[in-house]
Amino acid sequence: YWHGYLPILRPLLIFFNVSQIRKILLFVFVILFVWLIKLLKEKLGIATSIIFAISLIIQGYFFVSYSLESAPVFMVMMISSIILLERIDKIKNLYLYIFIIACITNFVDYLTVPLITLGVPLLIYILYKQKNDNKLKCKDYIKIIVKASFVWIIGYGITWLSKWIIYDFIYNEGLIKSAISQVRYRSESYNEYKTATIQQIVGILLINNLEYIFFMFDFAIIVLLMMARKYQVKMKKISVYFQENLPIFLISLMPFVWYFALGNHTIMHLRFIYRHMLIFLIGILICLKNIWIIEKKKKSVTN
């Protein structure tokens, strides 16, 4: 394992103890949370910002600040999302940006939930383009998702491989051979220390998140009923809904691809790997939100 967060953590330990560092991290997490939600409200609307806020809270965002190993990847996710929203119209090459995010993620992350640094910014980018760019079609968004995912994998993989090569070149300890065997081991779905299979665990993660989704759906229905006097709610046409939400749904499935690809890692580290479902939770709630068209009722004119 590569502890890329240590160059930052060690200087901090000179001046602060672990408890104080956790308080600093919590403060940083709160600032990033408020900043991101504010930008989401401005760029994508209040409903989307609420979905992101509740999803982050449900997946234990603020508790992550107490984990020195898990906090860095969440900070990368939040900061990259904020920069994306701040400069979304000025970023000329999305794929270069995704590549840089992937490299930074691999450097600082302890193999916790790295996929959130791809899934969350990509959701934000697609949602923004759907709102502001009428020229792009469903197939265009799918191409963006596939290309961005491929670029992220390349950036993540190259950075990881370069660490092995540099270390092996300096110390000549056969690290590359050992690393390859570990990759094979981590991608297996069987583990001698666990009785649960990867399919069972993914099923549990799915069911747990569906509970949150149904709760949010019921809450949204109540809100809509309360708004019924001033607003009218329409269902979108199936074709329009499908075209709009297929890209979002595909991004939502990313955690399951990760779980099945790295079955052994998922089984062994369920205590934190469930946070990948943040991508699923946000994506599915966005899809549910997009079912409705909410319009302000026109006042009847009487003579």
Task: Please give the residue ranges for each predicted region.
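Transmembrane-helix motifs of polytopic, lipid-linked glycan transferases
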Residues: 26-49
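Hydrophobic/aromatic-rich transmembrane helices and adjacent perimembrane loops
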Residues: 268-290
